[in-house]
Amino acid sequence: MNSLDLPKPPHETRVVVAMSGGVDSSVVAGLLKREGYDVVGVTLQLYDHGAATHRKGACCAGRDIHDARAVAETLGIPHYVLDYEDRFRESVIDRFAESYLSGETPIPCVECNRSVKFRDLLGLARDLGAEALATGHYVASRARPEGGRALYRALDPARDQSYFLYATTPEQLAYLRFPLGERPKDETRALARELGLAVADKADSQDICFVPQGGYADVIAKLRPEATRPGEIVDLDGRRLGEHEGIIHYTVGQRRGLKLSAGEPLYVVRLEPETARVVVGPRAALATRRIRLTDLNWLGDGAPEDIAERPVAVRVRSTREPRPARLSWNAAEACAEVELLVPEDGVSPGQACVIYADDDPRAQVLGGGTIRRIGALQAGAAEAA
């Protein structure tokens, strides 16, 4: 087996590298080229990059396409740019807007990986005769003894991106490779300099790529003018406390920007899109113990329907560490349910809940799903309050 767990020697193995124009994917292309693989670089143009060409912290924009092409020239590998704007708009941006209108807090990077990068790009790699698609994500995969691959948290905990990749299917995972999963970020930048790549000191992408300076509400309002429908801000008992200019300006757990005069700090507890109401309450009302998941993607052994009550660790936000929980299967509703052993604040519908085998820094990713606003979620908040 070669370094990618593939049977042929590197010079007989074609690998497509998804090149975003950043340092991570550029280093992946450089490392594989240096090892002798037949490397082909592909960059996706995902949105109208005119306004974002010179914006720092974005990805897949005009500057990034230029950088990816320059890296490919330095490495001496073929490079293709594909226009995926229409697919990205339909699969990611439109869904992002609809999710916010429904009172949810979506994670567009998860949907982009699931619906665009790992579906369409993987198919393209196969069409190009590649035996693997490699990316610059910080996540690890290892061969299973029985076949296929398993997903694990990255070596560098500060860079671990497993939260955003839980929706990778077993079939996709078998074809994908993540060469940076066992490397720290500092080593990646050092390798970029060693390889002579101009992007060695380029800043990492931070924002949602199609949202300038984090102003997601402006993007949604432009796509869906009805999103700015005003409404009431009420307390847990339904008493009117103030007004707002659209629920898209709020998310569960938010405190700033409420502009309310109250004797205690108030937080957004839930959003009611049907009535255009923002419900606020004390911090205790944010505590959630039970979560129901839809769109479950299962990467563990067996079928999710066979889960009785399994101890796991879950992450409900990308910035939080996995916490102990119990996972079970609700046969009546055909969905997974998670019971948090310690209540979590600010759990929002639309976010991802990622399931790990345990809370070890290198734990296996068992899968995950989308958190939905249902009775069980609100009941958990009420119990904690």
From Swiss-Prot:
Belongs to the MnmA/TRMU family. This is tRNA-specific 2-thiouridylase MnmA. The keyword Cytoplasm applies. Residues 159-161 are annotated as: Interaction with tRNA. It catalyses: S-sulfanyl-L-cysteinyl-[protein] + uridine(34) in tRNA + AH2 + ATP = 2-thiouridine(34) in tRNA + L-cysteinyl-[protein] + A + AMP + diphosphate + H(+). The gene is mnmA. It is found in: Cytoplasm. HAMAP family: tRNA_thiouridyl_MnmA (MF_00144).
